[in-house]
Regions:
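PLP-dependent amino-acid enzyme catalytic core
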Residues: 5, 10-181
Length: 181
């Protein structure tokens, strides 16, 4: 369970390094699509540089954020799985948590700002999450979500201040290096 001021989702300070990213890649590999890397034909003319595009829009939820969400979900203890997970998001992270938690039978509650675009809200619900609309912005929704996770003793999956999430998202870098050494 996340405690305020921690960054690895387990209540400890850690560090993201190549080893943790490689471990994440091994952990999530069976459930994440290795997206293609395409050389842009137009952008080099505008930037005077070679530009490659990593097509993460082809992931199940349409964004790279699910890599980190899945990595964190796969590191949950049995007790954390039973308690369910809580996250705060304005869209992509929440969809990743919702999809991968639901796929594994883990209850997911996603807190989103009241003014979240309908397409993000609808997709998060469609992936199986209980969505709570709260606050005027992400920070307000996140603070309330953390408070609820502490009350319920549920794991909080932070979208960016969690080393396990960051390592999962970092797996995109390993793919980039493999695809374009």
């Amino acid at each position: 369970m996340l405690r305020a001021g921690t960054n690895n989702g387990k209540g400890e300070r850690g560090m993201v390094n190549l080893e943790s990213i490689e471990a994440a890649a091994a952990r999530i590999g069976a459930s994440i699509y290795e997206s293609p890397l395409m050389h842009s034909k137009m952008l080099p003319r505008l930037t005077e540089n070679s530009v490659f595009l990593k097509l993460e829009n082809l992931q199940m939820t349409g964004a790279f954020k699910e890599r980190g969400a899945l990595n964190r979900i796969l590191t949950l203890t049995d007790e954390e799985r039973r308690q369910g997970v809580i996250a705060a998001s304005a869209g992509n992270h929440g969809q990743g948590v919702a999809y991968h938690a639901t796929e594994r039978g883990i209850p997911a509650q996603i807190w989103m700002p009241r003014l979240t675009p309908l397409i993000k809200l609808s997709a998060t619900r469609a992936y199986g999450a209980d969505v709570v609309l709260y606050g005027d912005n992400y920070d307000e929704a996140c603070a309330a979500a953390i408070e609820r996770s502490l009350e319920r003793k549920a794991a909080f999956i932070h979208p960016f201040d969690d080393d396990v999430v960051i390592a999962g998202q970092g797996t995109i870098g390993l793919e980039l290096l493999r695809q374009n050494p």
